[in-house]
Curated annotation (Swiss-Prot):
This is Low-density lipoprotein receptor-related protein 8. Residues 1-24 form the signal peptide. GO terms for cellular component: caveola; plasma membrane. The lineage of its organism: Eukaryota, Metazoa, Chordata, Craniata, Vertebrata. It is a single-pass type I membrane protein. Homooligomer. It is found in: Cell membrane. It comes from Gallus gallus. The gene is LRP8.
Amino acid sequence: MCRPALARLLLLQLLLLKLYLGKGAMKECDKDQFQCRNERCIPAVWACDEDNDCSDNSDEADCPKKTCAETDFACDNGHCIPDRWKCDGEEECSDGSDESEAACTKQVCPAEKISCGDLSNKCIPSSWRCDGQKDCESGIDEAGCAPACSPDEFQCSNKTCISINFVCDGYNNCGDGSDEKKCSPLTCSPNEFQCNNSVCIPQLWVCDNQADCEDHSDESIERCGYDAKAFNTCAAHEFQCGNGECILLNWKCDGDEDCKDKSDEQDCPLVTCRPDEFQCGDGTCIHGAKQCDKVHDCPDNSDEAGCVQESACESPSKFQCKSGECIDGGKVCDLHRDCRDWSDEPLKECGINECSLNNGGCSHICKDLKIGYECECPPGYKLLDKKTCGDIDECENPDACSQICINYKGDYKCECYEGYEMDTLSKNCKAVGKSPYLIFTNRHEVRKIDLVKRDYSRIIPMLKNVVALDVEVATNRIYWCDLFYRKIYSAYIDKASDTAEQVILIDSQLNSPEGVAIDWVHKNIYWTDSGNKTISVATADGSRRRTVFNSDLSEPRAIAVDPTRRFMYWSDWGDKAKIEKAGLNGVGRQVLVSDNIEWPNGITLDLLNQRLYWVDSKLHSLSCIDFNGSNREVLISSIDDLSHPFGLAVFEDRVFWTDLENEAIFSANRLSGLDISVLAENLNNPHDIVVFHELKQPKAPDSCELSPQPNGGCEYLCLPAPHISPRSPKFTCACPDNMWLGPDMKKCYKELPTTPATVEVPTTTTSHPAATSTVTVTGSANTTTAVIPRAVSEATTAIPSSHSTTSLLIDSEMTTGNSNLSQHYSNNGQGFDSTVTAAVIGIVIPVVVIGLLCMGGYLIWRNWKRKNTKSMNFDNPVYRKTTEEEDEDEIHIGRTAQIGHVYPARVALSLEDDGLP
């Protein structure tokens, strides 16, 4: 009787155990996931979103009624979207209710916008009217527009407008030659020189070491009495071109024409490539692995010519046999063996629809195949584990949107920053307000091109050799460097053509200024000098200046600043080409790019998207990185469009560059590098280029004016410190070259002050762990970095401070040469005064000596006492038997009066055993 009952009980226990184990083996989802009844895991945010993501609808069961916020629009299916997405021309509601006629009643456009017509609910900025770009679907914004050219302009046959001064000047400024048609024979004025080809140039340009006539007659030896090329002296590591240019010596006979006259590739021996290399059609050598890799590495694209594409069984209409063959998909399960191993005719799989059972385990779409099945996902989703679909975060692609990318389930949304609006046709963000225009150098003049109307005019004429420029939009000023005069100038743009309005800012200690940048927030100007191998800074009026860097620079060229984050960036095309970054006060210098870079010329900053762009004249490329040097990308690699790029600028979704070899200005999409177009041709050594628009220079607080004291309390220069963290210092004080900051870190002295600063001893101090302060010594020969201890207490000296987070900068003249000494302190740290240091040492040393003497006396006494102590152990068997679980007791009898004093079981006479040194 008991055995059957026991058996049934045992069987019941086994069943319960099986159920328990089955339950325990149930798949567990992560904390940020929702577990469906069918054990599927989905993101927790997908629950109760009106979508059946579990496929059993368990994620939509027992959901509370959803109420959209006041700033949201409620879709008819219950979804909530931002109200600004309603009636924007794109359906964000899955049911399209946000773009329905009921929701989109006729909009009333505000005063600063115009309507796209009765059949459209779209409003566009008034500045987009008659800008040459169709922004309304109907094109009504470009209808009935008057001719674009003003009375002082000439309209070319291609409808572009140029300054009337460019007509019949011997140059094809229109691009189609219409400005040089029907021109009477040129007659040069008394202040002009006539070239042998009858072209007139200013007399000022004759014998200036730069050929302006196509036949070089203005620089001939007969006229000038000397060979202009003899005046250019190249360094030992450089090669002098036939026209006097200097290039790196290792660029000679490398297969790439770097000299403008191509003399670096003349009389070169026949190039022989190594066995592991491929020789291009032009003779250059590339690594053999780069041949037929679907990337054009040779300048003539010969590395990709004649390549045989490997056959792959990747087409949906193909089937890959397990034995390796690739057969037509229609031959699968047709009762005929087409694969050697019969893998196209599996008996147990042909004719079976796996999707009929639980949707094949697919979370969304199950596609039955002749053999097996596969899971698919709707648009905006991707397979996570071959069965489960997950949302695609399109915003992970930095090129997904022009500016702002917002990812949501199954799709994404692009938006624009303040000051920009989305063009619904191109999906690009366009600037609102005045038309942007390009300003660029053209050797003897500065010109501008309106990017909307394509107006083309001259700003500054009659210059010698302008190579660098920048603008300050708020004040409408332009700054430029003239390489011939070795000076930096400034003027108001609308008055710059008048030489009387041109102000000389810097006219001394300049050798070869090739880059200039304006800090429009803190009103400073920065420039590079490849001759002096320095980077310098001055106030915008040029009254106060100093050298920021004078070491580890070879050929510094372009420079750009970011006053909002308080950093500067520059390119150096010397022996070790690189792009560097540092704070506007010279702190935190670091290399961003040092590999795969040869001849970096122009650089430019996209402040909105935090990207740095640069062109490489040796690699014929246009590349970009983020502000930390990461996410590097080559946008364009073309020897035709980037023959010798120099200047660079970026705005909206376009990047612009000048090219010395093509003598033109190009433009391309800054995200993809596609849509390359020519904006201006037939130029004369175009170098630098900038975009003039108010959105290019956003407003930001002046760090030096946040202090209660003017100029941050600095006697000379107040330089903004880089913004690294919320606790970063705001600025540092700086002195002119060969002068020192005083103890107060604000005043400047010709010699290091010897009079100590007043010291206030605080009544109480708060102890902190010792810190360190870095001292960087930058000299003409080398760079030394030392570490000095920082004050231990929080307050030791009374040094006036203009701001609680102000970093202090000490500049000094080293006795060994013109070197700069800069000591940077933390936010709340104070500098050591020499008197305070001496006082601290005078107190600490005696205390340490007395402490050591006391410790030595104590150790001698303890050692003597232990030597005069004897131990005896008594073993009582009876006592031990009754206390066998207790530890063994020891009784110590000493010669001293301290009878019965208990010592540790182990008596050590060695000082090392006591843990003492």
